[in-house]
Amino acid sequence: MALAGLMTLPVIAGEASEPTAGDILQGINMFTPEDGDPAYKVKADEKYGTQWAVDAAYGYWNTNKAISGTNRHTNLFLVHAQLNQRLIENTVHGGTWLRAEFSGSWGLDRRSAKSGTWFTDGYANASGLHADALGPHEGVIPELAVMQYFNHKRACVIAGMVNLTNYFDAVSIANDSFSSFTNDGFINTTIVPLPDSNLGAVFQYELDDNDYVMLGVSRTGCESGDNPFTSDDINGYVVVGEWGHIFADGDATFRLNPFYQRLDVDFGDDRGEHKRSNWGLAASIEYAVNDMCTVYSRAGLARHDHIDGNAGELSVGANIKLIPSREDDFFGISYGIFKGAVNNYRGYPAYLSDEDGESHGNRREQVLELMYSFQVNDYLKFVPHFQYIKNPAYRDASSESICGVQAVFSF
């Protein structure tokens, strides 16, 4: 499961009088102040080249339906932390940095802590509950890499064990780990494969003050939490690109993401390894309409020849400040349609049951999410939310609803 990154490329606010070289890449990679981030403080240890950010949360979810033998609710403690540590200082070109990331979730009661009865098994919607809800007791290191800047901070290479969600499709109003839309389909694209915990590299280049390009290459065989040097269950790779354009005086950002994926699948029998490939294109746009409203939209299509995932997606969303005097509070609403892939990599139709191979309805799942972020102070916020899911996981024509609340502590 792809993990959401804490820091994303912001829609550059109009408060910056004149953009300078490297501003775009700094917005993607570094933990810098940004509009709408009240928890950020200039930490004293930054003068030593240390940047860090931590989100810790309590999350409770309840569904109106659950598969027999699974729990209808869950209590989770979630953590997401990221670190940038400067290794070699170079004030002109940006220097050399170490990037590290940790993410995990733990069940807080007896049933939530058992994988066999865990909550997500009770509804199994295709786009997932939350990118950081990994399991009842699971903590992983999705990224540990070296970051090197060049050319007056206009170019950068990140190499090592990379988490591609930290760089690509970084729609800022939908990609915050705990504060915005909590369905995976709204946090990240469901079209572009964005693995974490895999060996890879990302190249970034700032073309001018309004345009940038990125190219990422990563293995795809290592699941979150596994050792990328020893995991070889599914050998493959993915190549992801991004062109981004900032316009409307910095209030809007458009992103275009082409990708190609290749897998060598070992079925574990006399058939041996089978090569599977996939390619597609996704795009997103976000726009700060005014001080009270920011909107976004994301769409994508994929070929999906025997590869797990979605073949199509279209989602729209908005963050709206309903109470002008509460500058840090906002109401979020998002709606998405996700089309299932024709086949997964083992050769079964992805919208069918691997066990019985029978059809369970159409291949379109629809998700509506409503949430409200209530900022208590600079460090604590409460986020109640509601999801309505039609045709969950493409397995039937029924619907489900999920209610939840998160208490998020950021520092």
Predicted segments — roles?
Residues 18-23, 153-157, 184-295, 299-303, ...:
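Signature for the C-terminal beta-barrel architecture of outer-membrane proteins
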Residues 57-61, 103-105, 162-164, 218-220, ...:
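Outer-membrane beta-barrel pore domains and translocons
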Residues 76-220, 308, 312-347:
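Outer membrane beta-barrel
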Residues 14-18, 30-52, 84-98, 151-154, ...:
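Short loop/turn motifs that connect adjacent beta-strands in outer-membrane beta-barrel proteins
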Residues 18-29, 41-65, 96-100, 108, ...:
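Transmembrane beta-strand segments of Gram-negative outer membrane beta-barrel proteins
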Residues 242-244, 252, 257-275, 282-286, ...:
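Outer membrane beta-barrel transmembrane domains
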Residues 399-411:
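Outer-membrane beta-barrel "beta-signal"
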